[in-house]
Amino acid sequence: MSTDQARLLLHCRGLVQGVGLRPLVHGLARRLDLAGTLDNIPGAVRLDLQGARPALEQLLRLLPELLVPPARLDGLEIRWCPPRCPSPRGLHIGAAATTALGPGLVTTALAPDLAPCGQCRAELADPKDRRHRYPFISCRRCGPRLSIAVAEPWMRSHTTLAAFPLCDACRREFNDPLDRRFHAETIGCSACGPRLQLLAADGRALAQGDESCLAAAVALLRQGGILALQAVGGFQLLVPAADGHAVERLRRRKRRPHRPFAVLVDDPGRLAALVALPPGALAALHDPAAPIVLLPRQADPGDPRAAEVAPPVAAGSPWQGVMLPASPLQLLLARDCGCALVATSGNPSGEPLCIDPAEARRRLALVADGFLFHDRPIARPLDDSVVQLVDGNPVLLRRARGHAPAPLRLPQPPAADRGLLALGGDLKAAPALLLQGTVWLAPHRGDLISAAVERGLAEGLQALLDRWGPGLQGLVCDSHPAAIGGRLADELAASHHLPLRRVPHHHAHAWAVAAEHGAAGPLLAWAADGLGYADGDGDDHRLRGCELLLLQRGQPVRRLACLRPLPLPGGDRAAVEPRRCALGLLHEAQLLDHPGAQACLGAFSPGALPLLLAALDQGLQAPLASSLGRLWDGFAAVLGLLHCQTHEGQAALLLESLAAGPAAAAVVLPSLTLPLRPARSCGQPPRLDWQPLLRRLLDLRQNERVPMAPLALWLHRSLVVSLVRGARWAARRHGCRQVILSGGCFQNALLLDGCRRGLAALGLEPLWSQQIPANDGGLALGQLWAVLQSA
């Protein structure tokens, strides 16, 4: 090998901090006899190496091949420089240029939090290992990252572990290039790391020392108590999943009467009697992100293990959310309890996640019976991520811990000179930042109807603008005039002197999927959800929830078809009272006198019904909405499944549960295609008319006595056929082949799977959300893309 000296300066961008990149390069550079510095800097890793040029070129070739996930190189800036004289000696790992994160919503290079790796799990269980049962075991391949970061770049002094100096034994591992904890910033042991504390709800100490605290916490759980656990990105509430009374008590105290709970298990072997494990399930569960994975319930009454999860846990859902431990502390608790545990977010419903022990004791005092704390502070709230499986591949429904703040991998990255900040929606808020050709989607923040969530989001957005404002050319938000996010956007745009663009809700849903797949267009897109606002375009309604769009770069989005609008008596109240949606359907279709309508009409008080009907007759307080979500709510109420709901999508979930169950096949009903009828007014798009479907539903239920489960499946199949045929009609007219399926309604597995298969059978290519949520959690990406594609 040539001895001529050369110097190579590399800037590595992507997921490069907290993933062992510098130790990897250190080992490679040692083998190649190179010298220099390996530094974390804000947003990148900077390598300044000197040695023989062939050796440096070999490092360039090998580096991308040797990276181990989740490490990821999205960009590599290479510069050859004159060699230093005298030549540097040795290799030095360090960091430079501190940037405080504050409440910032994204970081540009830091890995997400990672669940315990296999080696750490083995050490945790090994009585001979010095970290046996240490609740905070980690290495450079796993452990907390974003949840403890207070500044960039990644180094121990920039985390909430700064107050825990390493003992001599840990320091030796940290400095040993041959040790897997070489420069692992999160390591520690029982001699130098964080400690546990267990308190009763009244503040009394229940135990002292890690082992005593764990034992007492397990005893509390086994007695049916509710434990508030300081987990990775915030507090969790735990109860034994088999204890139906404890689960119901948790529901009352948390004010979450019906939304399904997820369960935590220490080992997938416990799942065989509880859920189906389709292809991809185990891989999704073992992902280092440790998400909640939605799996089909299949409790076998004959298997005693089926009793490990009481019926109130899933609350009638066809799916059971399951997760493996995201931290060694969770693993110890689950293993010591020896049973499945309900694991839900540590907050009263609708409020932000608790992250501070004092805050948790105050806000959860009437919820939890005990509090298991530790003294490693949480820097920012991070909910659990949620995925479902489509064809064996994970599809994100909530992008949070374990996935954020990793930059999105887009097939067609935007131009490096564009800088935009999009706020997303008021529900499932998750802003997105576009900078230097990369998009970062912030972790799920919750719903802005909570004043505390709104304050937290405003602080995070302000931190983003303070840091990256000079590189931005504008802000983007939803076009709804009453949106909370829109008000925030107005204030921020004015204070930072930035232009503001507003994007219609469904345009953003559709463009988000186009961005994820790198689809250039022309594209068709079904956008279907609860409600989204649209700007005035000459139509008779602006509240929409099911429309077929034509997308093409540089052209305005065209609306090709939509669902026939239905009146919503009481406006927003219809979203929480499916009986109002049903009343609007029956009134619009002139079916109030049908015998099958009486079950729904009887859900109203004698005094309320005449007032609502009078309002419908006069068109007062009954806005029109072409909403698939509200249509589904109305059908559920017509069938008598649910008249008032306590959480978003509850009625639709009950319909899906019936349709997915074994009883649905008891009666086979031919699908009914919704006719695509011309609109009443010139210039308006044709409408899928739901009235024949409603009339037939009433007849089947009242006259033919068809059970509810086959009816629910029939409704799903009829809608699938109608959406697929609508796409075929538009594809022939406009020469399109790709069809986007976007919006929260396509979280319904039956709808998504049916539409995917139906479109593919016609030679069309379906596109759907995978690495970003189909619901409003993916809106911000679509808002960015809508602006970029309009240029």
What does each of the following model-derived ranges do?
Residues 272-278, 353-360, 384-385, 405-418, ...:
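Conserved phosphate-binding catalytic cores of ATP/NTP-utilizing and phosphoryl-transfer enzymes
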Residues 514-587, 591-596, 617-618, 622-626, ...:
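Active-site histidine-anchored catalytic micro-motif
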Residues 237, 292-294, 384-388, 429-434, ...:
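Short beta-strand scaffold segments in enzyme catalytic cores
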Residues 1-186, 190, 194-197:
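Intrinsically disordered, low-complexity, mixed-charge
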Residues 186, 193-194, 425-463, 584-736, ...:
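A contiguous, well-structured pocket-lining segment that forms one wall/lid of small-molecule binding clefts
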Residues 66, 173, 336-414, 620-625:
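Internal gly/pro-rich beta-alpha loop/helix module
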Residues 226, 234-299:
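A phosphate-binding glycine/aspartate-rich beta-alpha loop in the early core of alpha/beta enzymes
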Residues 478, 497-509, 737-742, 747-749, ...:
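Conserved phosphate-binding/catalytic loops in two-lobed NTP-binding clefts
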